[in-house]
Every structure is written in C-alpha cells, then in structure tokens.
Regions:
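Alpha-helical scaffold segments
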Residues: 1-128, 132-133, 137, 141
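Mixed-charge, Lys/Arg-enriched low-complexity segments
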Residues: 142-148
C-alpha cells in the first residue's frame, strides 16, 4: 500500500487507527473520514494536527486551541464561537493568542509558551531573559495582560 494512499474505514479497524495516530498524529491525514473520537485524540496530542482534518467540528476546533492557541491559524473556517473566544494580537515582535472561554481564566500563548495562565505570563515577563530592564517588549506584554 502506498504511504500516501487513503486508508478506508473498512480496511482498518478503529483500534488500528488509534494506534496509528498514537504513533504520529499527522497520520490522520491518511485515514478516510476519521471519527470525531480520533480527531479529538489527535488534536489533544498536538493542536497543529487540525491542519490535517477536513471540516473539523466545533468541539475538535476548541480542543485544538485549548492544546495550543496558535492552532487557530490552521483552522480553515473557525466557527463563530471559536472566533469569539480567542483573540489574536500582533505585538511589535510576535503574535499573542488569548483564549478566553466563559467562566475560565484566560490562557495566553506566546511563542513556545502554550496556554499559560495570566500569573505565569506575568512571572515570565518579570523573571525570564533579564525581565523588564532588558527587553523592550515586556511593557507591551503587561499592557496586553491588563485587558484581561
């Protein structure tokens, strides 16, 4: 079987599909019509794998951005609810993603720091890479945090 050949639902049992995506989440692109259960497992491992899923449900979209806010960039048509709970903010040096679900604390994705709490973000601003004194963008980050 060619590596890029689609694997039909009849050819591969659900357990085998689960094992394939467990090994490598991007293998979902070779599974024809993966179930929502499989889609959820994949995006919970790696939010970026949503790029391999055609027409993901709102729940799959939500799980992808909960895993990594940057995943919003890989959703072709995010639902209106998804658009309403994530802000994409461009700063002088990078993009910041803020996930603000109702009744939950906002979560920030900044660079490789995925879905960190407000307190974690503030701690990083003051303590990493020399703090406010050595990084001119830190004040910009604090200004963003104040909005949430």
């Amino acid at each position: 079987m060619e590596e890029r050949e689609l694997i039909s639902s009849n050819q591969m049992r659900e357990e085998a599909k689960l094992e394939a995506i467990k090994q490598n989440g991007y293998a979902i692109r070779y599974i024809d019509n993966p179930s929502e259960e499989i889609q959820l497992k994949v995006v919970r491992q790696n939010g970026y794998t949503i790029s391999c899923i055609k027409n993901p449900s709102e729940q799959v979209q939500l799980e992808a951005i909960r895993q990594d806010g940057c995943a919003i960039e890989y959703i072709n048509n995010p639902s209106s609810y998804i658009k309403s709970i994530i802000d994409v903010l461009d700063t002088s040096n990078r993009r910041i993603y803020v996930l603000h679900e109702p009744n939950n604390e906002p979560l920030f994705t900044v660079g490789c720091q995925c879905n960190i709490t407000k307190n974690d973000f503030i701690w990083r601003i003051y303590n990493l890479d020399g703090g406010l004194e050595e990084n001119p963008y830190r004040q910009e980050y604090l200004d963003i945090i104040e909005r949430y």
